[in-house]
Amino acid sequence: SQIRKNRLHFGLVFQSFNLFPQYSVIDNIMLAPRLAAKEQIKQTGEYMGAKNHKDAQKIIRETALSLLEKVGLSEKSESYPCNLSGGQQQRVAIARALALNPDVLCFDEPTSALDPELTGEVLNVIRSLKTSDSTMIVVTHEIEFARDVADKIIFMADGVIAEQGTPEQVINNPQNPRTQAFLSRFNH
């Protein structure tokens, strides 16, 4: 269906990681591409140039290993989520979201469930993704990170947009009283 096809264009990273505990890191990353490959080969006869499942699996594994390298976890490919720190689990979740090469990558408070010491490693990975061709939507309370990475900031209050603009406009010169009150709690 069209909805199913559209889902492949979005990568989602949640605050609680949502990794499958029974799967290794590499299998968590490869799961969605395996399902997509199976369906695409059935419909079109190929997946990323591969004409059969065996060749598709090689491509998917190479991609997953490359993504693990990108997030700094190459050595953890055969580990299980329970053996990873929260920051490592979140980086695996990011690699998993990237595995289908989405057009839009959505992050829901990607650091809120992490110890403060682990926040930096996850933010650095997200920061490195800014140069990719994907659009990123990041829900965050990490004001300095938002200032550094965002092209546009939307401040929401009570489920509606209170203010939007460049980081300079919204963070340094907020016009809305709700935005001003929120930002006054941070040293920026």
Identify the residue ranges that each predicted region occupies.
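A short, surface-exposed alpha-helical micro-motif characterized by mixed small hydrophobic
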Residues: 146-148
